[in-house]
Amino acid sequence: MSSTYARFDTVFLLSRFAGAKYSPLWPSSSSSSHSSLLSSGIHLRAKPNSRLRSVTGASSSSSGPIIAGSESIEIKSLPTKPIEGQKTGTSGLRKKVKVFMQDNYLANWIQALFNSLPLEDYKDATLVLGGDGRYFNKEASQIIIKIAAGNGVGKILVGQEGILSTPAVSAVIRKRKANGGFIMSASHNPGGPEYDWGIKFNYSSGQPAPESITDKIYGNTLSISEIKVAEIPDIDLSHVGVTKYGNFSVEVIDPISDYLELMEDVFDFDLIRGLLSRSDFGFMFDAMHAVTGAYAKPIFVDNLEAKPDSISNGVPLEDFGHGHPDPNLTYAKDLVDVMYRDDGPDFGAASDGDGDRNMVLGNKFFVTPSDSVAIIAANAQEAIPYFRAGPKGLARSMPTSGALDRVAEKLKLPFFEVPTGWKFFGNLMDAGKLSICGEESFGTGSDHIREKDGIWAVLAWLSILAHRIKDKKPGEKLVSVADVVNEYWATYGRNFFSRYDYEECESEGANKMIEYLRDIVAKSKAGENYGNYVLQFADDFSYKDPVDGSVASKQGVRFVFTDGSRIIYRLSGNGSAGATVRIYIEQFEPDVSKHDVDAQIAIKPLIDLALSVSKLKEFTGREKPTVIT
């Protein structure tokens, strides 16, 4: 195999010799390997070096102890060829884990990424690496580190054991002024040998790479011919510290500290601590055996004095405990069952695989994500120190209900309706136009980072409750989640909202359904009757970014009626198999006397209309949704 070599000089690390130990995080070449980078003649391991040194003991340096170092590293060029199926979106690349474990599949994508970036974005630069702890993350970490070194990256900051939530990656990038970061996650999709894995890249602002880069990545996967790899040993990710090879270093960092520090800056922890330490206030957080399990105890228990047993499923597992780490009423059923008991907690929440989504519940009360972001925005200035000067602007994704619109109108704030995808919020934040935003898909966040943030949303709700309860004496009735929501509805009106998900539909039928709906839209006219509803307009949503002028088209088929009701159809490709058809149904109700009606009853006529208009059963063969939110 042909190879090229590069040498980097370094100052020899003088230290007490203690021997350097490395624990391979993937099988040896004699075992079933994850990549041809392992099974070919190159095993991504440095040659024996007599000058390998180790420093033991704690260090007061923020970068931790130096674990090992070497005078030089070899960079090898490994021949490769394009692999089909690496089309990349703003959520990165998601496939079944077995696909990523195929020869060079991940390595090709990582090299294609470096081939897509300007040299100054990574040469001698610092990049962050972390993920949600799912199966294959540790092995993938080693591949990414070696290819990063091979391409001239100066430093990798990696979470201990490869753990960093998606919000934490964004926070670390911003705090440490890194040039970007890799996030190893398939978000809320299941994990394990038979399930999903994913990878995406975030820019120096902490937000996902724009389409201009993801399109280049895909283009480069179609023409790639070599992978640049540094021959260094696997990095021990189990201990905080710095490992150096030539001019390249890997710093294993505490995955909690930077994120916790940011949360302490955003929120009044003393105020929240006063709430969670009350004997008459019940709290429960379900980490779903996902990445927020690593954050829940340090934040909620150790810092905010919640009871230790208030954290459920708090140990991150590679397969999420055989669960589906999607915080909704279907997949977080254990939490829902507890919250709907007569003696259930006052407040409950759950987060997803990589920690960027959230679900909020009161006792026997579910808060829709659309209402949640609106209520946070309406209360932010008085309850959250970060917003003392007031939010700069508000925004929601197009399918999200119009609840937030009414808050923006009352508070006289700039408002934006954007396509689904957090990058659209990030552009507005970077331009100073936006503070609080959300998506109906259980994503809520603010400009403290450039990703949605599950724990942030939970702390925001706890802040709102704590602000209302702080003067309540033991024995006095506490303000409940339901009280906060009902007060909001009385002020702004209620947007009845539901989403029907039909997961893993045959892609051909799902796409034909959307094309059929686009044909209806093209022929539609205002004033047409759809049952008892009168059409105001129908379109396929398009968005022109007010910051960079870019246009996103075909973002969802909308039917908007004169009474404010909406039906929206979208396809989601974030799963690793088939397509997910999503139908969103919304109806605004200003009459307080009608706010207690069950949402599914209130919008049933619209649901029936949505199914009839789309001919969903005819196109997909599906009679019932997989998930109703």
Curated annotation (Swiss-Prot):
Q: Report which reactions are catalysed by this protein.
A: alpha-D-glucose 1-phosphate = alpha-D-glucose 6-phosphate; O-phospho-L-seryl-[protein] + alpha-D-glucose 1-phosphate = alpha-D-glucose 1,6-bisphosphate + L-seryl-[protein]; alpha-D-glucose 1,6-bisphosphate + L-seryl-[protein] = O-phospho-L-seryl-[protein] + alpha-D-glucose 6-phosphate
Sorted alphabetically, which Gene3D superfamilies does this protein's record hold? Answer: Alpha-D-Glucose-1,6-Bisphosphate, subunit A, domain 3, Alpha-D-phosphohexomutase, C-terminal domain
Which residues bind alpha-D-glucose 1,6-bisphosphate per the record? 94, 187, 356-357, 420, 439, 441, 452
GO BP field: glucose metabolic process
**Which cofactor does the UniProt annotation name?**
Mg(2+)
Under CDD domains, the record lists:
PGM1
- What this chain does, per the record? Catalyzes the reversible isomerization of alpha-D-glucose 1-phosphate to alpha-D-glucose 6-phosphate. The mechanism proceeds via the intermediate compound alpha-D-glucose 1,6-bisphosphate. This enzyme participates in both the breakdown and synthesis of glucose.
NCBIfam families (UniProt xref): PRK07564.1-1
Name of the molecule in the record: Phosphoglucomutase, chloroplastic
List the gene name: PGMP
